[in-house]
Amino acid sequence: MATRTGVVCSAHGQSFVKVSQVVTSIPPSYLAQFREPVGYLDFARFGPPAHAVVELTARLAERAMTAGPSTVDDLMRQEARAEAAAARLCGAGAGNVVLLPNTSTGLFGVALGLAGEVAVSPAEFPANTYPWVRAGRARVRWLRPGPVTPESVRDALSDEVTAVSVSAVDFHTGYRADLAALREVVGDRLLVVDGIQGFGVLDEPWSAADVVVVGGQKWLRAGWSTGFAALSDRALDRLSPVLSGWTGVVDPGVFDGAPHPVAPGAAAWSVTNPNPIAAGALATALELVESAGVPALHERIVERSDELAEAVRSAGGTVAAPWARRAGILSFTLPGVPAQVVGRALARAGVTATARSGRVRLSPHASTKAEAVALVAAALRPLRG
C-alpha cells in the first residue's frame, strides 16, 4: 500500500493535491495477478491484463451466454462500478465520468463540441491531432516542435485560444507534462489531457485538467475497448455534447418519438450502452491499481527504468532526453545501429519492445522483474561499436 502527505493547492478556482512525500510498498497480492513474460517491456503499447481481469471477463461472458430475465440489467451494473473507480482515481465526481471504448472517441467528442481555437503540438500521438483536424469546428493552433512546456504554451496563447490539448506523457520520448504548471498558464481556458500513457501509474493532479481521456489497454492493463473521460463542471458547461446518442439524454428508456433533453453531467456524452464486459474489465483493473496505490506503482516503475537506462548506457547507448520528471517510457538509440536492428536483437533475446522513428522504446511496469534488465543488457552487448 502507499501512504502520502501533501498540501492542497489551487489554481483558477480548482483545487488539487501536490504530493510532497510518499512511502510505498506493493502488496504481493497485486504482483501475483500478472504473468507476462520476463522480457515484456512494451506497456506503452499494450499492458497484458491481470488474472482478475481475465477471469471476470470470462465470468461475465458466460453469464451473457446463459442469459435470463435479469442478466442484461445485472451486467449493465458494471458501468457504474467502473465510473466510480475512475472517479476516485482522478479526483472527480462519479457524475463527471463517462465510459468510452478508447481515447480517440473521447477526443473526438471534445473536438466536435469545442468552439474557438485549440493549441496542440504536431508531435502528439495522432489520436490527439486527428480529432482537431477532422472535426473542423475549432481552428488548430500548432505549438512549436518539442516538449509541451508551460513556456511553449504561453507563447502560443491568444484571446482566440479556448483550449490546450496535451498528452500527460509523450508516447515517443517519455516526457512528462507538468499539469499543475500548465493549469496556471492556461488560465480560464480548457485544459484537455490525453492520459493513456500515465493514468494509473503517475500520481498526477488529474483534477487540474478540465478533460482527462484515458484508454485502458496500456498501463491500466484492462484490455482493449476500455476507457473513460472525466470532465470538469467547466468543461461540461462549455462543450457541446455533439457526439451524444440515445443514452445521453433524460429518460433514455422512454421511447416516445421525441428528442429528449440532454442528460446532466458527463452522461450527456454517452452515445449508446457500453459493453458491460469491457466495463467490468476496466473496473477490476482500476480497483487493482487502488489496491496497490499509484505512488507505489510509479516508484517501482522508475526504479526499473533507472536500471534499464544504466544497461543502455553501459552498452554505449544514448537515452533520449533523460527528463527529471519521468514516467515509464525510456527511449534510446545505439550510435551506428539502426533501431530496427536493435529491436530484432532484443526480440531474439526474449525482450518485447517497440522500435519506431529511429528509436527503441522500453516501457516497464511495476510487475517487471529485475531479470528483464539482464536480458536487455545481454542483447545490447554484442551490438556495441
Give the location of each predicted region.
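Pyridoxal 5′-phosphate
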Residues: V8-G385
